[in-house]
Structure formats: structure tokens, C-alpha cells
Amino acid sequence: MTSKDPEPRSGFNGTLINLDIQKVQKIFKTMKNTILVFILTLLSTACANMDRRVHPASATSTRGLADTVGFAHLDWQMDSVMHRINRTFPSELLTAGVQPETAWRVAICPHDDYTYTSWHYPSLLKNLKAKTIIVFGVAHKARQFNIADRIVFDTFTHWQGPYKKIKVSAFREEIMAALPNNLFLVSDSLQRIEHSVEGMLPFVQYFNRDVEIISILVPFMSADRMTQIAAPLASSIHRMMARNRLGWGKDVSLLITTDAVHYGDLEWGGKNMAPFGADSSGYAMAVVKEHNIIDSCLVGGLTVDRIRKFVTTTVRPDDYREYQWTWCGRYSVPLGLMVALNLQQETQGKPLNGKLIGYSTSIDHHPLKVDDLRMGKTAIANLRHWVGYASLGYE
């Protein structure tokens, strides 16, 4: 017997072959339709439950690393990076004049390669004292997933850290449970490839080995949509804090991330992002504009009008998915600050005032040496391709 010409099985007398072909076809058609309906029902149920998808209490999963070049991911790397920052940038670390006992309720931090951003991380994050940090991250790849208009959580129980795994706070489920379904979704896929949250965590853990986090990515959304999300999200956070008797700044803080302007006409995916020109004159004008944005929107008393001014400055009025001025955190910053403003009102806390810790660019100082630490650069830095960095704290 061969596979091409098999013998009939024992007892196979040919009677079955002579069955009514139409009847057999009808049976198979019915079975096919039943299976199709079953599959569609499963898919529909899965989509309907997507927003509430969480791991069972007994399951554990660790969010891995998206960038092992620009960021440290091992304990000895972090120790070396901190030693070099302290040795290389002592004046930058002291310029802000923040007292050691200061505890930020809200902080805005860059997330670029350590070789470029260096001193911004410790000068800001050393005053993040809370055990639970709610992070508002950029969703750089949201367009690939067609995600917009809803904040994005994950289901991971831990994130990879240089000293040990970073626990995801159980408060995440409390916050999600209190939110309307149409305001958020869960996407481990988007969270897994997003680098903005990941970049800050080694420094956060350096200063607090027992820190716990909640990662919230903020994709494309209009200012009006931010307002719709911010109020219930702040209420959910406030109720969680009240139930667990937690203090804002002492036990829970908000950490917002953004890099400032992405400028130049080289290696930006074929785009020209140099409205003032890609030379020294254009650089100077761009930096002036940067400080105008920071001073008029972020430094000093936080108000709704100043937050909305940030949106109109960085987001195109005719298409909220597009840049007006290229801060990658054009959604994470205003939404995070709207949540903070609502939370300040709910907690009846003192007004939030932004303090500029520092501003720099990837080309206004010598990069921190990291190439001997199994680290490096993920992008070039020159007049035709540079990035701005602003770090701010709100006490």
C-alpha cells in the first residue's frame, strides 16, 4: 500500500460511497455554519471583554525590555551610570536647588538615551518619594495598533528592573474597575514595545528598591477627550487613595514622561522637522521657542488654560493626531496634568506649581560615556538631528 493508492479499511464494502451525496453536503454545510457561528461568538466575547482583561491572582508575568542599548538594564550598569553622572555633572545636579525632603506629587521626565539625557533623571527622580508611581507614558506605536482616544493599561504583574523585578501595584485593578469601559483598554502588545516608561524605571528603582508602578499609555486624543478621561480617572485614583489611606506625594505620585522637541532634517523618517532651519541659527530659535512653551505652560501655577495652551502649541488644530510642535508627549503631558489638577481639587490639596529642574538638548553638552558599559546611542545627535529635554517637579 502506498499513500497515493491506499487500500480500503477492513469491512469497507462500498455501501458508504453510494450514500446520497446531496444529503452529505447538506450535513457538512450545517456543521460549517455552526462552527462559524461559534467562532464569531468567541471573537465577539473576547472583544467585548478586552477592556477588563486581567491576569488571575495566581498568574505572574514580567514585562521585558524594549531597549537594552540606550537604557541600563543591569545593576552594575546603573551603579556605573550614577557614579559617572555625579562625577561629570555636579553643577547641573545642584542648579535646581531642590531640598532633599521635597516629595513631588507630580513630575515630568524625559526618556531618551542615558548618554544624552543623563543628569535629568537623578536630579528629578531622587525627589519622587512615593512607593506607588502612576506613570503616564507616550504611546509611540499607537498608530500601528490603530489605538486612539482611550488610555492603555497592561496586565503584567511585574516589569523588569536592574536590581530586581518591579512590582505592578494591585491598585491598578482598583483604578480600572472604577472607570467606564469606553475610556480605556488593555494592550500588553503596545505596552511591551513602548520605551518611554521603561527608560525612567531604573532610576526610580535606584532611589527606591521597593517602588511599585502602574503604567498608563496615552495615545492620540483631542483636548476634549482628555477632559472626558481626566475627571473620572482622577476620581478613581482619589477613591483608591482614600480607601487605602494613602497620601499624595508621600504614598502615591504621578510621573509623566515626554522628550521635548525632535528637531532637524536628517534621519527623522524622511521628514523635515526643522521649521527654523537645520543650522546654528535654527537651533537657537528652536531653543527659544522651547523655553517659551515651558515657561508659559508648565512652570508656575497649573491651570486648565495653561494645559490647553500646551495642547494648542504642540497639536495641530485641524488634526489632533499630528504634531504642531514635535514633543512626543503632546498627549501624555496634558492628560497627566489634567488628572493632577482634578486630583488636587478632589483632595483639596495646595495648588500645584511647576518647578523647572532643567532644560538641555542632545547637542549642548558632551554625552555621558556609556559605550564601555554595553550601552550606546539609538540615534545621532547634531544640528540636523537633535532632541530637547525638560524636567519639572510639582510639590
Where does each model-flagged region fall?
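Positively charged n-region of N-terminal signal peptides that target proteins for export
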Residues: 26-34
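Sec-dependent N-terminal signal peptides
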Residues: 34-43
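Long, Lys/Arg- and hydrophobic-enriched amphipathic alpha-helices
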Residues: 342-344, 348-395
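Active-site histidine-anchored catalytic micro-motif
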Residues: 50-334, 338, 342, 346-347, ...
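Residue-identity detector for glycine
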Residues: 11-14
